[in-house]
């Protein structure tokens, strides 16, 4: 595997210093179940990638053949690697060329290997880090209950949002918009007040426990929580763009949603949403996919029309209200990581 200190692509939409900070973090680029057979194309931080699985190992590399620059995603998969469609060069599990059809038996030049990146397969997702320090790799975000007995693992289809990842994540953390945006899925338009809550800083970002009477049953459902039941929503923010939400239902039922916002560019985000739950295990996963997408779709218009498109980390640039505690903690966390005052505008 060839690894180098990466530099932003020529067409990069990020500030170069912000790009490098993001490149040092883990981001999801595909669902693991989708990496089987033909090479898969993905884009992360404006870098075009090829993803393939060979001999049980997942490879994430720049989507370019080092011979004549053809995208390897135009090629095909064989037992021993992926094959460039131009001259038939084949690249194996370590990213090295292992066949040159036009020169059988000849030494293979050392330059014929892919620029590949660190890979982790977790929570049903393929994660990569474009600038991973092998001696000090960054921690991968964690997801509560994913491996716990009795919990069903669900991985919803990915989808794209035409907006900045930071804006989308901030919306996921926001608890004041439920009664205005999510009334067709789970929220009550008459339940608008936001009780006090206090985010707590952690080594990976922050956590916040939000107690309220806002339920999480589908609006069309006949099920209701017991009278006076208080719902706990436990948020864990893993900077920069991955958050989890654990919702405590009646009778010790739990629903965990990971909101993993993968920055395709500074203006496009690919969303991944693993889910774990210990109830309604008889319900088809397709129904879970559909409901989860409906909730995300309710947020889409807000995220895609916010101005500025980036996330102002200078807190004096926008007004704030008491319900914005998580939003403020998020922006402060990004600022502490070193991102610019006017992040990715």
Where are these regions (language model features)?
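Rieske [2Fe-2S] iron-sulfur-binding domain
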Residues: 2-18, 28-153
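Short, positively charged
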Residues: 18-22, 273-275
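Soluble or luminal CAZymes and related metallo-dependent hydrolases
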Residues: 21, 111, 291, 295
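A short, structural micro-pattern
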Residues: 23, 113, 120-122, 255, ...
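Short, solvent-exposed secondary-structure boundary motifs
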Residues: 25-43, 103-115, 183-191, 220-227, ...
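A broad, low-specificity signal marking well-ordered, structured residues that form hydrophobic/aromatic
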Residues: 26-27, 40, 49, 117, ...
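C-terminal catalytic domain of Rieske-type non-heme iron oxygenases
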Residues: 134-345
């Amino acid at each position: 595997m060839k690894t180098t200190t990466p530099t932003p692509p020529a067409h990069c939409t990020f500030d170069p210093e912000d790009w490098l900070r993001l490149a040092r973090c883990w981001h999801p680029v595909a669902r693991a179940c989708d990496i089987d057979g033909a090479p898969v194309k993905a884009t992360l931080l404006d870098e075009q990638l090829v993803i393939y699985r060979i001999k049980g190992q997942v490879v994430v590399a720049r989507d370019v053949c080092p011979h004549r620059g053809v995208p390897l995603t135009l090629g095909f998969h064989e037992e021993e690697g992926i094959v460039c469609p131009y001259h038939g060069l084949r690249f194996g599990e370590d990213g090295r060329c292992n066949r040159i059809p036009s020169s059988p038996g000849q030494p293979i030049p050392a330059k014929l290997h892919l620029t590949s990146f660190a890979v982790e397969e977790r929570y049903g997702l393929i994660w990569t880090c474009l600038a991973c320090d092998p001696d000090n790799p960054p921690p991968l975000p964690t997801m509560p209950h994913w491996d716990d007995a009795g919990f069903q693992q669900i991985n919803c289809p990915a989808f794209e949002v035409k907006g900045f990842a930071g804006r989308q994540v901030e919306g996921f953390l926001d608890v004041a918009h439920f009664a205005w945006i999510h009334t067709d899925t789970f929220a009550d338009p008459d339940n608008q007040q936001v009780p006090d809550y206090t985010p707590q800083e952690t080594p990976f970002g922050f956590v916040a426990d939000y107690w309220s009477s806002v339920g999480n049953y589908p609006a069309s459902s006949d099920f209701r929580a017991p009278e006076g039941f208080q719902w706990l929503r436990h948020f864990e923010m893993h900077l920069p763009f991955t958050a989890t939400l654990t919702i405590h239902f009646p009778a010790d039922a739990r629903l965990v949603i990971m909101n993993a916002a993968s920055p395709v560019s500074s203006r496009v985000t690919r969303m991944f949403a693993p889910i774990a739950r210990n109830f309604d295990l008889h319900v088809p996963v397709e129904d879970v996919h559909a409901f989860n997408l409906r909730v995300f779709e309710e947020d889409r218009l807000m995220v895609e029309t916010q101005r500025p498109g980036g996330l102002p980390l200078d807190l004096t640039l926008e007004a704030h209200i008491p319900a914005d505690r998580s939003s403020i903690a998020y922006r402060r966390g990004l600022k502490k990581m070193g991102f610019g005052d006017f992040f990715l505008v």
